[in-house]
UniProtKB/Swiss-Prot annotation:
The protein, known as: Probable endonuclease LCL3
Any GO CC annotation of this UniProt entry: membrane
Entry keyword Transport: no
Chief location of this protein within or outside the cell: mitochondrion
GO MF annotations, alphabetized: endonuclease activity; metal ion binding
Protein family according to the UniProt entry: Belongs to the LCL3 family.
Positions annotated to bind Ca(2+): D113
Source species: Scheffersomyces stipitis (strain ATCC 58785 / CBS 6054 / NBRC 10063 / NRRL Y-11545) (Yeast)
This protein's encoding gene: LCL3
Subcellular location(s) per record: Mitochondrion; Membrane
First-level EC class: hydrolase
Residue ranges of every copy of the TNase-like domain listed in the record: 59-217
Keyword terms: Calcium, Endonuclease, Hydrolase, Membrane, Metal-binding, Mitochondrion, Nuclease, Transmembrane, Transmembrane helix
Active site: R108, E116, R156
Membrane topology: Single-pass membrane protein
Length: 235
């Protein structure tokens, strides 16, 4: 029996431009879907979900402030994709503390140190309550964007926090320093400023000249770092 002649015009090689184009399209779609899922679908629940890549890329995270615990830190419920992914209308943010357990990141504001509150029977610094009240009113129960830099020894995510106000997006650390309710972070290790260190120092100098907040204390003013060294030595 004679062999059936092959029609070379119907053969398609794996290296055919159409095959290569289709393969490239499938690969690109899969990659973009993966990146979209990572950035806009996957929730980061605790510091254990923060990868080195997220820190290296300073990947912006959008979420809701569930609680302000101190003058320079707060609890953050990650809501990837925001309202476009249903947060706030289709997907509810828990309000019960038990429901929020292991579901939030502790954010430590970068570049700023607020006056120390009373802990373990130790005295509170002047303006510590004012700083807490200010931060609570500024970001509490609001959506913010955080830019992560590192994780500190207390498992907090050190980050820049930004919140929308009527006058635009505000850097929370900068606004706290502007009000004299925090000073530029003075620790020699673990300091994170992003690209705003010069701005923070200029705002601090202005608040000091205007005697705002802690700077109204004059020579009685003690920095949070000095206060901790004096009252928490050996703890």
């Amino acid at each position: 029996m004679a062999p059936i002649p092959q029609n070379s015009s119907t053969e398609v090689s794996l290296l055919h431009p159409k095959v290569l184009l289709l393969s490239a399209g499938i690969t690109t779609t899969a990659f973009l879907s993966y990146k979209f899922h990572q950035r806009y679908v996957t929730r980061l629940r605790t510091y254990l979900d923060i990868t080195p890549k997220i820190l290296d890329n300073q990947q912006k995270l959008y979420g809701y402030v569930t609680r302000v615990g101190d003058g320079d830190n707060f609890r953050f419920f990650h809501t990837p994709g925001g309202v476009f992914m249903g947060w706030g209308w289709l997907r509810k943010i828990p309000t019960n503390r038990n429901q929020l357990k292991d579901e939030t990141l502790m954010i430590r504001l970068c570049g700023v140190d607020a006056p120390e509150r009373s802990h373990w029977g130790k005295p509170a610094q002047p303006f510590s309550e004012e700083a807490l009240i200010w931060l609570s009113s500024y970001v509490g129960k609001r959506y913010v964007t955080v830019t992560p830099f590192s994780i500190d020894q207390y498992k907090r995510l050190v980050a820049r926090a930004q919140v929308w106000k009527w006058t635009g997006k505000k850097d929370v650390s900068a606004e706290m320093i502007r009000q004299g309710l925090g000073i530029v972070y003075e620790g020699k290790s673990g300091a994170e400023f992003g690209d705003n260190e010069a701005l923070y120092r200029n705002l601090e100098a202005k608040a000091k000249r205007q005697k705002k907040g802690v700077w109204s204390l004059g020579k009685k003013m003690t920095t949070p770092g000095e206060f901790k060294r004096e009252h928490y030595r050996g703890d």
